[in-house]
């Protein structure tokens, strides 16, 4: 009985520790850039019908590019959002990118707002974990 209890407690501790490590895949370093993936970071940030995950690439405290990842948003509208927003933060310092005023895409407001929120999540994460 004591062995089973000890085993269960050990398993619970290991699982708790693993849950704290979940953020390790959020920010990686690639080709001298920090890459922040909002797939798990922004999993609750949804556009019209689905999450809108992104990768934000940062080098020397400056946004290099935004990469739109696969989403279940309506393709017709998500493509419009991607075309309109993909380069809005490029070349800006992280500080300036966080305050950049970006207009939403007409007809794709929810998707646009979700993308903007994911960019802000990525920038905040970068600043607190670099």
Specify the residue positions occupied by each region the protein language model found:
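Flexible, solvent-exposed loop/hinge segments and secondary-structure transition points
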Residues: 2, 6-7, 21-130
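Bacterial N-terminal signal peptides
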Residues: 8-18
């Amino acid at each position: 009985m004591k062995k089973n209890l000890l085993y269960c407690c050990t398993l619970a501790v290991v699982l708790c520790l693993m849950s704290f490590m979940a953020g390790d895949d959020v920010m990686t370093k690639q080709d001298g850039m920090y890459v922040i993936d909002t797939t798990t970071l922004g999993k609750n940030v949804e556009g019209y019908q689905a999450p809108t995950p992104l990768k934000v690439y940062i080098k020397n405290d400056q946004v290099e590019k935004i990469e739109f990842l696969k989403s279940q948003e309506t393709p017709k509208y998500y493509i419009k959002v991607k075309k309109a927003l993909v380069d809005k933060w490029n070349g800006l310092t992280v500080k300036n990118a966080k305050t950049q005023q970006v207009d939403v895409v007409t007809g794709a407001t929810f998707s646009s707002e979700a993308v903007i929120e994911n960019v802000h999540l990525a920038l905040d994460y970068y600043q607190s974990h670099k």
